[in-house]
């Protein structure tokens, strides 16, 4: 009797979610800048009233330790240190009565401040 091994390939879930809304806004901002090499860098740094805060910037350079996600032709970069705090997070863009802004829904945050710009983990 011969043994047949069945290999089942499953797609690994993405480490974070980059929404269509966020990708569309980033594409719009990159078009305004006129530099197609720009990528959105999302990072975590110390600060804020809860200990950590999120930051957003444009970057032309992808570092060796960056995690990259591309959606609708737009690239999002997260450095290795920030990655551990953002695993499972959703990076979104909201434009509603409260204003227009990038929003991070982070399941790793144990608490957030009232303004939502800082968190503790």
Swiss-Prot record:
Biological process according to GO: iron-sulfur cluster assembly
Role of this protein: Required for insertion of 4Fe-4S clusters.
Known cofactor(s): iron-sulfur cluster
One MF annotation (Gene Ontology) recorded for this entry: 2 iron, 2 sulfur cluster binding
A Pfam short name: Fe-S_biosyn
Cofactor note: Binds 1 iron-sulfur cluster per subunit.
Species, as recorded: Polaromonas sp. (strain JS666 / ATCC BAA-500)
Keyword Oxidoreductase assigned: no
UniProt xrefs under PROSITE patterns: HESB
Protein name: Putative iron-sulfur cluster insertion protein ErpA
Subunit structure: Homodimer.
Similarity remark: Belongs to the HesB/IscA family.
């Amino acid at each position: 009797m011969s043994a047949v091994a069945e290999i089942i390939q499953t797609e690994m879930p993405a480490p974070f979610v980059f929404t269509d809304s966020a990708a569309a806004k980033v594409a719009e901002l990159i078009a305004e800048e006129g530099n197609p090499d720009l990528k959105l860098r999302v990072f975590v740094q110390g600060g804020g009233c809860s200990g950590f805060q999120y930051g957003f910037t444009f970057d032309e350079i992808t570092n060796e330790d960056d995690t990259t996600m591309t959606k609708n032709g737009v690239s999002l970069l997260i450095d290795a240190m920030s990655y551990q705090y953002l695993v499972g997070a959703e990076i979104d863009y909201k434009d509603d009565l409260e204003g227009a802004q990038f929003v991070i829904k982070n399941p790793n945050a144990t608490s957030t401040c009232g303004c939502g710009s800082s968190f503790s983990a």
